[in-house]
Amino acid sequence: MKAPVDEMLVTDIAGRVAVVVTDMMTAADGLIRLGFARQSDRWERAIADDNDRQALVAALIDLDALFSTGRDWSPQALVEYYREIGVVRSGYRSVAWRGPAQYVIERHD
């Protein structure tokens, strides 16, 4: 799947490590401030517990990151769960793939 250009894409956040993919040089400072470290083709950050995960989700929403859709506990599914239980109260954006290079970005207010 080809990641959207000039976007921050959260590909994993339900496990013990959050993963963000981006080609935006301007995103580096924000990700470093959140504790992310650059790997070869992505940014990674350990997640201590669910409180840490909730704070990280809120911070990534503030950075206008895209949360990837998918099966099981996709980043978008986790944000929706946090909205249902009242942890996330703001809007966010998600991305769904329709093909290897086709995607749809949706705003959830």
Label every model-predicted segment.
Residues 1-109:
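Accessory DNA-engaging acidic/polar modules
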